A protein has these predicted regions:
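Enzymes that bind and transform nitrogen-containing heteroaromatic metabolites
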Residues: 1-162
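Conserved small/polar residues in nucleotide/adenosyl-binding loops
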Residues: 164-170
Length: 174
């Protein structure tokens, strides 16, 4: 099981404001879809509500303190249960936000797919601080949206120091 964080953020690590993403980059959405299709995605309730529907061709797992029995979504109350269910569906588990969910899974992640967007926007939701010395950049692709005049970069990082593994019970059932 590999846990990967996937996120796009502007300067100051802004990932959202008022439950919305403060930019619209089609290539980033395409990148997100290409990376996550066929895999498990874990998100918080607010992220799910901002998307408004389950993401197609993925196992959608929503972490929430108050499950509401959402159709076509698996709701869980903790990261251990999220990982247990997700690992039965796919080898790579993508953590897609929001802020609190990224914070919970960052110590467990072995890979990060980040889109750094070179714009300043106001935000109330942020990607967590992370220690760059714990990670190695595997790839970087610098891009520009000519219609919006926005520069951005797709980055892929792998953790270089050992990280916390969460051991699942051997007799766990999904």
């Amino acid at each position: 099981m590999k846990i990967s964080l996937i996120a796009a953020f502007a300067k100051e690590r802004v990932i959202g404001k008022g439950g919305k993403i403060p930019w619209n980059l089609k290539e980033d959405l395409k990148h997100f879809r290409n990376k996550t299709e066929g895999c498990s995605v874990v998100m918080g309730r607010k992220t799910y509500e901002s998307i408004g529907k389950p993401l197609s061709n993925r196992l959608n797992i929503v972490m929430t303190r108050t499950p509401k029995k959402i159709k076509d979504v698996t709701e869980v109350i903790n990261k251990e249960r999220a990982m247990e269910i997700a690992s039965a569906f796919s080898e790579e588990i993508f953590i897609i936000g929001g802020e609190r969910i990224y914070e919970e899974f960052l110590p467990l992640a072995s890979k990060m797919y980040l889109t750094e967007i070179n714009i300043e926007v106001e935000g109330d939701t942020f990607f967590p601080n992370w220690n760059l010395s714990d990670w190695k950049e595997l790839s970087r692709k610098d891009c520009k949206d000519l219609n919006q005049n926005i520069e951005y970069s797709f980055l892929e990082y792998v953790r270089t120091v050992s990280y916390t593994h969460l051991t699942l019970p051997t007799n766990s059932r999904v």
